[in-house]
């Protein structure tokens, strides 16, 4: 159960500015950001992650290996050039998670999840949903444990 301080914001595209809210949350990170993505072509989000990395935040990204090979993770080179470690999850038919964890072990964790792939189409053309869940420590810990488990079987992008 969430603590009394937990806040949940629901966003629906294309009406709501999901990417703006996601980028704003990323910009407030202080310690670490963990991303798990199926499709990732949003330069706005990639640039926000690179800015966070340059500000000293520990940023790491897991992407679906097959989607990377098919071009569905077109920002991978930019992230790598920005010194953001990228890991390839090829152990599943689809590594279909779409999550961002911000300061997951802190007193003010943020979990971002939903149907929303990190793409321009998800914001402008698709009917998608995004939940931004703040201050729910046990949920953030569960998502972080899951992220860590996927990281264990993922390989670094070369």
What would you call each of these model-derived segments?
Residues 1-6, 10, 18-19, 44-158:
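PLD/PLD-like phosphodiesterase catalytic module centered on the HKD motif
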Residues 18-32:
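Secondary-structure "cap/kink" motif recognition
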Residues 31-34, 110:
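Structural motif
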Residues 33-37, 60-63:
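Active-site beta-strand/loop signature of hydrolases that rely on acidic residues for catalysis
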Residues 9-14, 35-38:
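Short, flexible loop segments at the rims of nucleotide/cofactor-binding pockets, characterized by
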């Amino acid at each position: 159960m969430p603590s009394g301080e937990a806040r949940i914001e629901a966003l629906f595209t294309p009406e709501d500015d999901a990417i703006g809210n996601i980028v704003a949350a990323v910009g407030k990170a202080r310690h670490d950001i963990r991303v798990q993505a199926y499709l990732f072509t949003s330069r706005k989000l990639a640039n926000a992650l690179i800015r966070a990395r340059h500000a000293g935040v520990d940023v790491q990204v897991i992407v679906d290996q097959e989607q990377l090979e098919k071009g569905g993770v077109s920002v991978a080179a930019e992230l790598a050039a920005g010194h953001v470690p990228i890991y390839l999850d090829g152990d599943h038919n689809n590594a279909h998670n779409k999550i961002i964890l911000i300061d997951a072990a802190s007193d003010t964790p943020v979990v971002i999840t939903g149907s929303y792939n990190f793409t321009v189409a998800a914001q402008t053309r698709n009917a998608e949903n995004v939940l931004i869940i703040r201050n729910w420590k046990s949920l953030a810990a569960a998502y972080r444990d899951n992220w860590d488990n996927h990281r264990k079987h993922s390989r670094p992008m070369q």
